[in-house]
Regions:
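Phosphate-binding/switch loop-helix module in NTP-utilizing enzymes
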Residues: 137, 217-253
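N-terminal accessory targeting/assembly segments
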Residues: 1-96
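Nucleotide-state-sensitive switch-loop elements of NTP-binding domains
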Residues: 170-173, 183-230, 258-276
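Conserved nucleotide-binding/hydrolysis micro-motifs of P-loop NTPases
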Residues: 49, 59-61, 75-76, 93-96, ...
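P-loop NTPase nucleotide-binding/switch module
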Residues: 67-69, 83, 96-144, 158-163, ...
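P-loop NTPase nucleotide-binding module
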Residues: 130-182, 225
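Conserved catalytic network of the ASCE P-loop NTPase/AAA+ motor domain
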Residues: 139-141, 166-171, 195-200, 230-235, ...
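Conserved catalytic/coupling modules of large nucleotide/cofactor-utilizing molecular machines
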Residues: 230, 248, 258-456
Length: 456
């Protein structure tokens, strides 16, 4: 950019990560990047004929009123292409893994309109994960969005890490992991584990962690999606998109909204919550050229499923996998709640009559057990009828069979990680429902893979 085209202004206000700047020559466009010293600022609002308000994407230390600001004339542009595989990036598409520069041939804006409905496809095909509780009770959709919903410490990140490992071995497409506002330590651990299992060469990682500016956390999801869309549209490959955590995306938007001076709505969230979430979620879809399958962790604050952030996220999901604190406290891992978890794929037309019938029988058995728990607590198991005792025995064995040792947690538990085919998981559940394992102790079914392991 030569000096005659240089659009320079000056900072007139600094409030945390919100910057106001005046441009006499030409007003920068919405979403344009501004550069002020070492700080990068994104334009969000035009305040007047000469003034813009933007949010900083990098630390603002050293900025002061009167500091010069340069309009770069473009939005955030990230590299796309196969050269990105095996690398770790920030919101600007700059590598942060100390592996040198990325020789990308193409850069794209992180902003793009969602694909038109007429161009979207609905595949209605199961996406097998190798995790019994998910595949049997809340199967994921290829090209759909699955949410892992739960409070703090119930195992969302561990489940996402296990999904990456399971899918890396048999999955033919590209995996893109997007870390939004999560712990740096977890990101670093995940990078090492993906490298160890040999899946890094088919994975791209994009991070804006807890310590970064809310503006960066708010935009990193769009940056990762831009990379995913390239593989779907240009390379015509399926993409697995993992997002940890959608709640942190909403939280970053709330921080930005407050600093921008917008009046909050319910529970202090930004009034534009639904729109902002939809801008991200509606870009995740399948077309004739490829599918983007998304698995998203959604933190549930104080285990409150009526929280507006969680309610709005629910609306975009085709499969909701709810993690239960109660099950986690009993040591039933993965702590997937079989009664609250739901999937639109669990229909006889998609999964077949046998799978649907087994899943409904599991739910019915576990629901009846739940109703009997109060009687057991007051009077004891012996006071139940013979039929009710059978229901309790089946339910307790099903609960234990649906637990599973993970490769991710091998070094904590000492148990070898197991990946179970859907057919084996259905076979095991069906045999338990037929009382084939009523004589076996409950613990023989705990933390195993296939049902035959209980006989050893």
């Amino acid at each position: 950019m030569n000096d005659s085209n240089l659009n320079q202004g000056e900072v007139i206000s600094v409030r945390g990560s919100v910057i106001d700047a005046r441009f006499i020559k030409r007003l920068p466009k919405i979403h344009n990047l501004l550069k002020a010293g070492g700080a990068m600022i994104e334009v969000l609002i035009h305040l007047g004929a000469e003034t813009v308000r933007g949010v900083a994407l990098t630390p603002t230390q050293g900025l002061a009123r009167g500091s010069p600001v340069i309009d770069t004339g473009r939005p955030i542009m990230v590299p796309v292409g196969e050269k990105l595989l095996g690398r770790v990036f920030n919101v600007f598409g700059s590598p942060i893994d100390n592996q040198g520069k990325v020789e990308a041939k193409e850069f794209r804006s992180i902003y793009k309109e969602p694909i038109a409905l007429s161009q979207q496809t609905n595949i209605s095909e199961i996406f097998e994960t190798g995790i019994k509780a998910i595949d049997v009770l809340a199967p994921m959709e290829r090209g759909g969005k699955a949410g892992l919903l739960g409070g703090a410490g119930v195992g969302k990140t561990v489940l996402i890490m296990e999904l990456i490992q399971n899918m890396a071995g048999k999955y033919e497409g590209i995996s893109i992991f997007c870390g939004i506002g999560e712990r740096c330590r977890e990101g670093e651990e995940l990078y090492r584990e993906i490298k160890e299992v040999g899946a890094l060469e088919k994975t791209i990682m994009v991070f804006a962690q807890m310590n970064e500016q809310p503006g960066a956390r708010f935009r990193v999801g769009h940056a990762a999606l831009t990379m995913a869309e390239y593989f779907r549209d240009e390379v015509r490959q399926d993409v697995l998109m993992l997002i940890d955590n959608v709640f942190r995306f909403v939280q970053a938007g709330s921080e930005v909204s407050g600093l921008m001076g917008q009046l909050p709505s319910r529970v202090g969230y930004q009034p534009t919550l639904a729109t902002e979430l939809a801008e991200l979620e509606e870009r995740i879809c399948s077309t004739g050229s490829g599918a983007i399958t998304s698995v998203q962790a959604v933190y549930v604050p104080a285990d409150d499923f009526t929280d507006p952030a969680v309610v709005h996220a629910f609306g975009h999901l085709s499969s909701s996998i709810v993690l239960s604190r109660k099950m986690a406290s009993q040591g039933l891992y993965p702590s997937i709640d079989p009664l609250q978890s739901r999937s639109k794929m669990l229909s006889p037309l998609v999964v077949g009559d046998r799978h649907y019938r087994i899943a409904q029988m599991i739910r019915k058995t576990l629901m009846e057990y739940e109703e009997l728990k109060d009687i057991i607590a007051m009077l004891g198991l012996e006071e139940l009828s013979q039929e009710d005792q059978k229901i309790v025995n089946r339910a307790r064995r099903l609960e234990r069979f649906l637990t599973q040792p993970f490769s991710t947690t091998e070094h904590f538990t000492g148990l070898e990680g197991k990946m179970v085919k859907l057919e084996d998981a259905l076979d095991g559940c069906e045999r338990i429902l037929k009382d084939e394992f009523s004589e076996y102790p409950e613990k023989s079914l705990y933390m195993i893979g296939k049902i035959d392991e209980a006989m050893k």
